[in-house]
């Protein structure tokens, strides 16, 4: 074992072992638990950026962990290869998009391999290849014949710069999502997917997706936007709020309006901001809500928390004043960011009201009766006859809906709303670099789908577009053809499909990428699907994830897959952000400098307080941390990182710096720290191995000091297993391993048992880090004399007996100040603990002459003696 940690050699050796052994190629193994782990495939833009590295490292850690659980793990990779950037690059460099795309794929594939990802490359798909898109064309012709795809004149969003049509979702604040150009409306004939026919199912089956972040499901619900309900305005109480106005809520249960006992607003709601102005406690809670998590924590399952404000709003029918609460279960981007809370008939409101002692007023007679005692019963949410509702008593849901609507309309405080926001998906694009639409236009037969035996309609790959509309429309050799029905001269469709179509089904093709008898091999598809864990950015919450769910249902209805949903669990990783630096130009613009070219000065808390450009030594402005981007020139090249430190350091930093669903702030010192930690692990292992490997550990013969070391080992296993396996909190799992390393570095190594214990400790470190830093762990495992490769080892099991403590160290406080420590048997009673604390020599000094009023014992932690 080399004395120094040499990442380059270690990583090359591990990768070459995995390649030669085909370690990550999988096949269907009936009877073995499967795990399909998928990260969103990249667009081959030229080279990987840190966002890619983060995404694929998270996926890889999960895949490798699941393999250590004994599962048959599929982790494939491919290329979302059609799209606008290839055309733009082609125009700029006068090169065919195909050539540019394939060169980028080759380079990026090598980059992905250098990260050491456990990918089955035998399943690679490239969406711009005819053997992939022919099946997309086949499905198109099937759906066209069934009427699920149709052609009509549509008013479209026309991007005058990109010369193409954009979907509604691709228009942000009236501008094109890619070009930033102001969008025009135009009428042209287009093909549409009838996604509205699936709107109800797309909405309803969201409820089955327990493993999805609530935020994403909410965004999809809002996008589909089915709402049969009422918008109700609660007038401000001027005395407490200080001005006139209304708080709007949208409710699907206006029949329960008379049971509203408080209102709850999201942390970002204007009333929350107002209430927090002179209330530091509330401001702190709001900050906590904003930090926390709709990203990963499922709102439905997290603990409901809230704080009261001094604000009141008026009940729109009774005028009664209702308190305004700020609550973590109300989302700003759902509805109006406020809810009228009816605890008797809504489970979340019920939980909240019960916790905070708010009134619960039943106003609907349900199958559970007229009362709503705790605990919550599903029956409380039923429709039924109104009670305790004054003039509305006795009305059913429909009757109450109508009567309450009339009353609210009279006051100008409410109206009914029912709608779907979702529109059919227009997929025609006047672009070249996309999948050709398989339709032939015949003067006598109309629009004729291309017959299956004539598929694929191949896109010519040697075209260099010039930016003015579609080159295909100027290529008679492409569009001139004969009608498959009548044989007359006809014209091929020259529009191509929206590139979101390719990414809507790629996950299914991975199950049988080389199958040539259909879109998927149903047997293989049903073996692997649905995907167990999908990982990608929150920016795909609506578009891609909605379209993929839609396509999965289309494939199901074609008999290709049997499941209803494509992705069982979804993890949306946060952005990678970094400091920005600039100088303001004379024209008011900004010249951005890469952090690598800037010398910074930091204060004691490591905050940047000054910056100079290395080349001229003159100051630059500090722009704050922003998402890494070309426009702000604050990207860090992953390749430079891997070359300098190795992939394991890169991976360790990515996983340690932040939980996966939060933003990750780039930090050179953090990368240095990750590198230092791996060198520490290597040093300890080297010293241990050089002394010769020890014999077996005799657990029964351990002394107290050795028991404490072994307890640290198994505590790390226990914590890391929960963190990685249940919560994807890789950062805290790594912290556990760091804590364990501190113990192992100080542990004695004199005796044979000491060394056997260190062997168990180092094996544990290697196993716990194996999914995160696979190369160094591959090498350590061999050096520690273990048979086989660590990728085939089992995740370590906790020995609960090792966690049992014979004695505990408790701190003793006098009037809240630390005054001593006591050691007591773990089985000691409260009285024995109290006696030991009172008798502590230092404690006696501080209680002398005082009367002890009470003794507070926090089991396992501390004793506080209150004396005066």
UniProtKB/Swiss-Prot annotation:
A motif ('HIGH' region) lies at residues 42-52. PROSITE patterns: AA_TRNA_LIGASE_I. A motif ('KMSKS' region) lies at residues 627-631. It catalyses: tRNA(Leu) + L-leucine + ATP = L-leucyl-tRNA(Leu) + AMP + diphosphate. InterPro entries: aa-tRNA-synth_I_CS, aa-tRNA-synth_Ia, Leu-tRNA-ligase, Leu_tRNA-synth_edit, M/V/L/I-tRNA-synth_anticd-bd, Methionyl/Leucyl_tRNA_Synth, Rossmann-like_a/b/a_fold, tRNAsynth_Ia_anticodon-bd. GO terms for cellular component: cytosol. Disulfide bonds: none annotated. Signal peptide: none annotated. It is found in: Cytoplasm. CDD domains: Anticodon_Ia_Leu_BEm (cd07958), LeuRS_core (cd00812). Keywords: Aminoacyl-tRNA synthetase, ATP-binding, Cytoplasm, Ligase, Nucleotide-binding, Protein biosynthesis. GO terms for biological process: leucyl-tRNA aminoacylation. Pfam families: Anticodon_1 (PF08264), tRNA-synt_1 (PF00133), tRNA-synt_1_2 (PF13603), tRNA-synt_1g (PF09334). GO terms for molecular function: aminoacyl-tRNA deacylase activity; ATP binding; leucine-tRNA ligase activity. The keyword Cytoplasm applies. The keyword Nucleotidyltransferase does not apply. ATP binds at residue 630. Its EC number is 6.1.1.4. HAMAP family: Leu_tRNA_synth_B. Belongs to the class-I aminoacyl-tRNA synthetase family. NCBIfam families: leuS_bact. This is Leucine--tRNA ligase.
């Amino acid at each position: 074992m080399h004395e120094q940690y040499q990442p380059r050699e270690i990583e090359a050796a591990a990768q070459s072992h995995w390649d030669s052994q085909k370690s990550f190629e999988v096949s269907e193994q009936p009877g073995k638990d499967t795990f399909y782990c998928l990260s969103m495939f990249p667009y081959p833009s030229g080279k990987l950026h840190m966002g890619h590295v983060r995404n694929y490292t998270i996926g890889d850690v999960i895949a490798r962990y699941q393999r250590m659980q004994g599962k048959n793990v599929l982790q494939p990779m491919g290329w979302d290869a059609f799209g606008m950037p290839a055309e733009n690059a082609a125009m700029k460099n006068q090169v065919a998009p195909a050539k540019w795309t394939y060169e980028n794929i080759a380079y990026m594939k090598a980059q992905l391999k250098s990260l050491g990802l456990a990918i089955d490359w035998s399943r690679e798909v490239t969406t711009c290849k005819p053997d992939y898109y022919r099946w997309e064309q086949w499905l198109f012709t099937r759906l066209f014949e069934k009427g699920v795809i149709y052609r009509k004149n549509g008013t479209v969003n026309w991007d005058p710069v990109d010369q193409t049509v954009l979907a509604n979702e691709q228009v942000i604040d009236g501008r094109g999502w890619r070009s930033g150009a102001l969008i025009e409306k135009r009428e042209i004939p287009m093909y549409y997917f009838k996604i509205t026919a699936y709107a109800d199912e797309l909405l309803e089956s969201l409820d089955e997706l327990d493993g999805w972040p609530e935020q994403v499901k909410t965004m999809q619900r809002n996008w589909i936007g089915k709402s049969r309900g009422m918008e109700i305005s609660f007038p401000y109480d001027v005395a407490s709020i200080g001005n006139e106005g209304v708080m709007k809520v949208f409710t699907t249960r206006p029949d329960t309006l008379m049971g509203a006992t408080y209102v709850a607003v999201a942390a970002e709601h204007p009333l929350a901001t107002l209430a927090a102005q002179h209330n530091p406690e509330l401001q702190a809670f709001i900050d906590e809500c904003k930090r926390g998590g709709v990203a990963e924590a499922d709102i439905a399952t997290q603990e409901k928390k809230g704080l009261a404000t001094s604000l009141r709003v008026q009940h729109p029918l009774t005028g009664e004043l209702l308190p305004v609460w700020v609550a973590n279960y109300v989302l700003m981007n759902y509805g109006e960011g406020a809810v009228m809370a009816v605890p008797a008939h809504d489970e979340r409101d019920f939980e909240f009201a019960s916790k905070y002692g708010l009134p619960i007023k039943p106003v609907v007679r349900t199958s559970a009766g007229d009362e709503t005692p705790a605990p919550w019963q599903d029956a409380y949410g039923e429709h039924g006859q109104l009670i305790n509702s004054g003039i509305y008593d006795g009305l059913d849901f429909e009757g109450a809906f109508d009567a309450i609507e009339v009353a609210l309309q009279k006051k100008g405080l409410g109206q009914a709303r029912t709608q779907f926001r979702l529109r059919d998906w227009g997929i025609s694009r006047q672009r070249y670099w996309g999948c050709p639409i398989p339709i032939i236009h015949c003067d006598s037969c109309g629009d004729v789908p291309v017959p299956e035996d004539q598929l694929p309609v191949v896109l010519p790959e040697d075209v260099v577009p010039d930016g003015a509309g579609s080159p295909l429309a100027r290529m008679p050799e492409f569009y001139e053809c004969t009608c498959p029905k009548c044989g007359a001269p006809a014209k091929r469709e020259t529009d191509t499909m929206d590139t979101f179509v390719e990414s809507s089904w790629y996950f299914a093709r991975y199950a049988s990428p080389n199958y040539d008898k259909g879109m998927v091999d149903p047997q293989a598809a049903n073996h692997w699907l649905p995907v167990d864990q999908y990982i990608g950015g929150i920016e795909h919450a609506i578009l891609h994830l909605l379209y993929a769910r839609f396509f999965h249902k289309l494939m199901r209805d074609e008999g290709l897959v049997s499941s209803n949903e494509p992705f069982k669990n979804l993890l949306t990783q946060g952005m990678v952000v970094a400091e920005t630096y600039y100088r303001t130009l004379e024209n008011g613009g900004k010249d951005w400098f890469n952090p690598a070219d800037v010398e910074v000065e930091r204060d004691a808390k490591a905050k940047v307080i000054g910056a100079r450009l290395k080349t001229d030594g003159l100051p630059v402005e500090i722009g704050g941390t922003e998402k890494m981007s070309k426009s702000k020139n604050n990207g860090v090249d992953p390749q430079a990182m891997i070359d300098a430190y190795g992939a394991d350091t890169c991976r360790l930093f990515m996983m340690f710096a932040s939980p996966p669903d939060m933003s990750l702030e780039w930090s050179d010192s953090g990368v240095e720290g990750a590198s230092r930690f791996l060198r520490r692990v290597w040093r300890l292992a080297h010293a241990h191995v050089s002394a010769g490997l020890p014999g077996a550990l005799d657990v029964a013969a351990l002394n107290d000091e050795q028991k404490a070391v072994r307890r640290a080992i198994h505590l790390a296993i226990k914590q890391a297993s929960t963190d990685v396996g249940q919560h994807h909190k890789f950062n805290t799992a790594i912290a556990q391993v760091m804590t364990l390393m501190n113990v192992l570095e100080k542990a004695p190594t004199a005796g044979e048992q000491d060394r056997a214990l260190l062997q168990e400790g180092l094996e544990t470190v290697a196993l716990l880090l194996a999914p995160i830093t696979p190369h160094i762990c591959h090498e350590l495992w061999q050096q520690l004399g273990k048979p086989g490769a660590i990728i085939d080892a089992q995740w370590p099991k906790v020995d609960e007996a090792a966690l049992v403590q014979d004695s505990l160290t408790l701190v003793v406080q006098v009037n809240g100040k630390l005054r001593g420590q006591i050691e007591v048997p773990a089985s000691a009673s409260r009285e024995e603990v109290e006696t030991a604390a009172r008798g502590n020599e230092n404690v006696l000094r501080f209680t002398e002459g005082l009367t002890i009023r009470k003794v507070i014992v926090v089991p396992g932690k501390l004793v506080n003696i209150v004396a005066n």
